[in-house]
Amino acid sequence: MTRRYWNINLEEMMEAGVHFGHGIKKWNPRMAPYIYANRKGIHITNLTKTARFLAEACDLVFDAASRGRQFLIVGTKKQAAALVARAAIKARCHYVNKKWLGGMLTNWSTTETRLHQFRDLRTEQKTGRLNRLPKRDAAILKRQLSHLQTYLGGIKYMTGLPDIVIILDQQEEYTALRECITLGIPTICLIDTDCDPDLADLPIPANDDAMASIRLILNKLVFAICEGRSSSIRNP
């Protein structure tokens, strides 16, 4: 895998609060190699290691994108929902930014059936066929469509399991992470000081609570994916 320059700046990461971890009482000892210090009862993440792992992740997604691989971005925190959707759409990735439905990946046949139903309902809505149904029937189907849009809207074009899953909060998205582990799908995870780095294929030690931190990490990964996709177009 070729190493590239991704303009990862330690000062920029400090300004975004990437280095702030959790209180020392709320930590996972397996994170010790990634912790630089304890300041006023708060663990401080070693940003040099963050930069190294983030660069590795950018190299990985660039190479994967240049080979046409499919990505799924998972971040269901309410405050990050819009950010996740924008970033994923920009990089032409699938995403889940509401609730993770258990079995979304491990029970793919059921998810696929729901997606077919979702696409059919969208077609019926676009062609106006829903409005030609009796009001009660139309109302029921519109509620179904709204529900499917909320939870499956970000994966509506997904036709198979993703090649790489990017997880923005290991604790919050634990079910998604376990499904990836079960299926052997590689994961890139933001890991705060209360996380288990051994569960991720490629961990990025970083603050997973601050929006500025999440935005910075996600923007770097999305930029690398976009560059990889452009590379495949330039060099088919």
From Swiss-Prot:
Question: What does the UniProt entry say about where the protein is found?
Answer: Plastid, Chloroplast
Q: Which SUPFAM superfamilies match?
A: Ribosomal protein S2 (SSF52313)
List cellular component terms (GO). Answer: chloroplast; mitochondrial small ribosomal subunit
GO terms, molecular function: structural constituent of ribosome
Q: What InterPro entries does this protein map onto?
A: Ribosomal_uS2, Ribosomal_uS2_bac/mit/plastid, Ribosomal_uS2_CS, Ribosomal_uS2_flav_dom_sf
Report any one BP term from Gene Ontology: translation
Q: Which domain of life is it from?
A: Eukaryota
Broad class of where this protein is predominantly found: plastid
Q: Which UniProt keywords apply?
A: Chloroplast, Plastid, Ribonucleoprotein, Ribosomal protein
Q: What does the similarity note say?
A: Belongs to the universal ribosomal protein uS2 family.
What protein is this chain from?
Small ribosomal subunit protein uS2c
